[in-house]
Structure formats: structure tokens, C-alpha cells
Curated annotation (Swiss-Prot):
Notes concerning its domains: Comprises two domains: an N-terminal domain containing the nucleotidyltransferase activity and a C-terminal HD domain associated with both phosphodiesterase and phosphatase activities.
Cited PROSITE patterns: HD (PS51831)
Listed Gene3D superfamilies: Beta Polymerase, domain 2, cca-adding enzyme, domain 2
Protein name (Swiss-Prot/TrEMBL): Multifunctional CCA protein
UniProt similarity note: Belongs to the tRNA nucleotidyltransferase/poly(A) polymerase family. Bacterial CCA-adding enzyme type 1 subfamily.
Species whose genome carries this gene: Acinetobacter baylyi (strain ATCC 33305 / BD413 / ADP1)
Residues in coiled coil: none
E.C. number(s) listed in UniProt: 2.7.7.72, 3.1.3.-, 3.1.4.-
Length: 413
């Protein structure tokens, strides 16, 4: 029985990239042998076991044969005679098809180290085309390793396009698509994930609302990058640079979906695109089955982002109603996320990536001001239903004073 470290841990070890999970493959053993050593079985479709002490996963070497549609459509075969090479050839990319023994010796039958050195994401074999999930995985790897200069091999991209053409992407469950996409969104260049999906025509299948943005023009005086799709990915890159949460990144990704629905006769203007975007944001979010809180933020950013850009010129009452719609008193963290997403939108423009966004500081201050005014601060003679009315008025008055301070400071600059 031989045990090898495999997959991502070997890849990232050789690359010098941090990793946390370790997976092992066991060659020349039977399930009973592992059970006798105290391993716990956890695999449903094939023999995977947890180490009795470390709880790391150990899988028996196996082969697979396609038997149906989708990433579940495989029959697996495991036997003590299955070799390490047989196990590694079923993997997606050469850089994931390496193994390391307990002495640190690397086994690389399919050229993974060379592709690692040349910064290439290349499929191991033509069996790559049998699993539609690999389109998403390779796109995610492209986003993760872009910092090192990795590119997808031309022949691999062609196979990804072929998978799209088979229609098997539609067999992927919403949960699986979101699992891969949410992980990709948290990479430091998440925009590359969506760019790769577009290159292999998968974006139109899985995210048609986002794909529809490409080729839609915007007014160049506001958006020098012109293309709505490019603006969306530039905005997402800003969210990644600021290391914002998944909620913010998703909201940024979908904030302009309404621009794909703008009547052609008014282009490149996008009047009311915030309202038009609500239905596609709702539909995409429901289809992906994303968490409710994340969807609510995305809808708020879609509907209100122009108000945030205009915050310093809004009337105090209008600003209060905006903060109220954002649930400022109960959910200040959502208002903070909203402001961050709007800032990414403002900076996701060609040549304006580092431009100041004073609206953010103003909105944060406005949030603090209204939250600082509480019922116990009101005069004692104010009672009953009048308390709510007076609280609103006090908050609006405080916002008016804040706006005056900002206006005065701008006038003296």
C-alpha cells in the first residue's frame, strides 16, 4: 500500500501558493485494509475515508467511465491493481495531476511541472470534455492564478467551447454553479472567471443576464470604457482590490443588469436602468439560490446606486428616505456594504479607477448622524405618536446641518 499527496496541495506547494486542504490517494489497498487501520468511510459514490487522527481525506485509487449526462454521470472502478497513473489521468488539468510521496518525491506522468513553470492551464486528456463542471473549475483556476501569469491553453479552451456546445452545462445544478461561482468571486481577480466563461460561450448559458451587457454602449463622457459588460467586470475588479465581502462582490456584479434592457432608441443613455434591473437581479438570484440577505443587498444596490452617487446633492428628506429604505437603524452593516458597492461602480471606469469618491465618506457620516439620534434624546414633553414624527424631523434636520457643513467645506476649498 502506497500513499500519495495529490491534487491542489502538490500544485500549490510547487507554486509557493498557500494551501490548507490536503487530499491523499491510496494505491494497492482495499477498503477493508483502511477500515482495519481505523479509517472512517465517508464517500457515497466511491471509497473515500477520513484519517483516524488528522481527519484528512484518503481516496482509493480509481478509474472512471462516463455513463450519463452531467458531472454525476460516471461509473467509478476501484481496485488494488489501479495504478497511480490510472488515477491521475482522470483529473482535469496537468497541474492537478501530480502526486508526492511521503519522502517528497514528485510523480508527474502528464507534464504538470512543465505547465506549472510555463504558467499554462492544460487538460490532461480528451476525457476532459466528459465533465461539464470543468468549464467552471478551469475558469476559476484562471481567476485564482492570474496573479502568476497563468493562461488557458488554446486547445483546452476549444474543449471548453465544445462542452458548451453539447448542452451539458444545463445539467449542472444551481447549487453546483453557485458553489463554483461564489468561490471564484472571492478570488483577487474574479472578473477573469466571467471573462473566461464568455470566451467559451458558457456565460450566455449560465449567466445570460450578465452576458447580455456586453456590446451595450454607454455615454463615453461618463464611461470611457463604453461597453456595459466591460464596466461590470472593471467594477468587480475594484471590489476584489478592496477585498470586499462576497455579498458586496455579487451586488457589484449585478448592479447594472438593467442596462441590457434599455430600449435601443435611447442608447447610449440608460434612463431608469435601475428599475429595469430589479427583475433580472431577482431572477438570477433565485435561479442560483443565493442567500436571501445577499439578494436583498444586490437589489438595493441595483435600485439605489445612482442615489448614492448623488448623495451630496440630495435634499435632506430624500437622503433620509434613502437611508430608511436601506434599513439604516437596524442594519448599519448593510448600508456600509451598499456604500462600498457603489464606490466600486464609480471606480469601475476606464481611467477613473483611482478617482476620489467623497460620497462614501458623506454617506458614512450621514449614517452615523441619524443613528446617533434616539428617542431618549427628545424633550420630555414629546409623547405618544409624536415621538416617531419628531425623531424623523430631528434626523432630517441633522442631515441638513451635515449637508451645510459639506457645502461650506467645498466652498472654502
Amino acid at each position: 500500500m502506497q500513499v500519495y499527496l495529490v491534487g491542489g496541495a502538490v500544485r500549490d506547494h510547487l507554486l509557493g501558493h498557500p494551501y490548507h486542504e490536503k487530499d491523499y490517494v491510496v494505491v494497492g489497498a482495499s477498503p477493508q485494509q483502511l477500515l482495519d487501520q481505523g479509517f472512517s468511510p465517508v464517500g457515497k459514490d466511491f471509497p473515500v475515508f477520513l484519517h483516524p487522527k488528522t481527519k484528512e481525506e484518503y481516496a482509493l485509487a480509481r478509474t472512471e467511465r462516463k455513463s450519463g449526462i452531467g458531472y454525476h454521470g460516471f461509473n467509478f472502478f476501484t481496485d488494488p491493481d489501479v495504478s497511480l497513473e490510472d488515477d491521475l489521468i482522470r483529473r482535469d488539468l496537468t497541474i492537478n495531476a501530480m502526486a508526492m510521496d511521503q519522502d517528497g518525491n514528485v510523480y508527474d506522468p502528464y507534464g504538470g511541472q512543465k505547465d506549472l513553470e510555463q504558467r499554462i492551464l492544460r487538460h490532461v486528456s480528451d476525457a476532459f470534455i466528459e465533465d461539464p463542471l470543468r468549464v467552471l473549475r478551469v475558469a476559476r483556476f484562471a481567476a485564482r492564478y492570474a496573479r502568476y501569469g497563468f493562461k488557458i491553453a488554446d486547445e483546452t479552451l476549444l474543449l471548453m467551447q465544445s462542452i458548451t456546445q453539447t448542452g451539458e452545462l444545463e445539467s449542472l445544478t444551481a447549487e453546483r454553479v453557485w458553489k463554483e461561482t461564489s468561490r471564484a468571486l472571492m478570488e483577487d481577480q474574479a472578473d477573469i472567471y466571467f471573462d473566461v466563461l464568455r470566451q467559451c460561450h458558457a456565460l450566455k448559458v449560465l449567466f445570460p443576464e450578465i452576458d447580455a451587457l456586453f456590446g451595450v454602449p454607454q455615454r463615453p463622457e461618463y464611461h470611457p470604457e463604453i461597453d456595459c459588460g466591460i464596466h461590470t467586470l472593471m467594477s468587480l475588479r475594484q471590489a476584489c482590490k478592496s477585498n470586499y465581502s462576497l455579498d458586496v462582490r455579487y451586488a457589484v456584479l449585478v448592479h447594472d443588469l438593467g442596462k441590457a434592457l434599455t430600449p435601443k432608441d435611447i442608447l447610449p443613455r440608460h434612463i431608469m436602468h435601475e428599475e429595469r434591473g430589479l427583475i433580472p437581479v431577482e431572477e438570477l438570484s433565485n435561479r442560483l439560490k443565493i442567500p436571501t440577505q445577499m439578494k436583498q443587498l444586490a437589489l438595493a444596490v441595483c435600485k439605489e446606486h445612482l442615489k448614492c452617487h448623488q448623495a451630496m446633492s440630495l435634499k435632506p428628506g430624500t437622503l433620509w428616505r434613502l437611508l430608511q429604505r436601506l434599513d439604516v437603524l437596524r442594519r448599519p452593516e448593510r448600508v456600509e456594504a451598499f456604500i462600498n458597492a457603489c464606490e466600486c461602480d464609480a471606480r469601475g471606469r476606464l481611467g477613473l479607477e483611482n478617482r476620489d469618491y467623497p460620497q462614501a465618506a458623506f454617506m458614512f457620516k450621514a449614517m452615523q448622524v441619524v443613528r446617533s439620534i434616539k428617542a431618549q434624546d427628545l424633550p420630555a414633553y414629546i409623547q405618544g405618536s409624536e415621538i416617531g414624527e419628531k425623531l424623523i424631523q430631528y434626523r432630517i434636520d441633522a442631515l441638513a446641518e451635515l449637508k451645510k457643513q459639506y457645502d461650506d467645506s467645498l466652498a472654502t476649498e
